[in-house]
């Protein structure tokens, strides 16, 4: 799986019923994020925080889908612990990928994996802590893979989505540590003549290839 590739479509059981992935995305943006195993500490904090900030994703027209190789029944039982300890229960669908189908399809687990998922330890599933940001065109815009011992920064995922949505609409790029409302960079594909039409107020250019303008609205 690479940035720019079309995401594989699939059908799966989730905590909110059966879905076909591309149909579920529709014309929205989407996040598919996976975790190694239910009833584990780091994942508990992650899923609770994702539930807390779900309104921020909805405001950006982004749907959320979780995934692990546990059953949907396990997900539902674990949700009670998440709500008790984190203050928020998962309020988005979570795939029960007990046959490893989606994890294999997305390259999170080797294609020859088989057996009882309940017998697998979190370490066995260490490669299943991924984040995929997917555009309305069903293409991958961002891939993040985290180690077992490091919880994900979903605030950073929001920041990247802000950048992706801005740069999809305007021919700009966002610089290091950019936040919404800060200056952006005119894309290298835009000639100076075209930039003059787009930005008649001009731009700052410490180097010819570094053309800085206020964020377009």
What are these regions (language model features)?
Residues 1-217:
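Chalcogenol-based redox active-site neighborhoods
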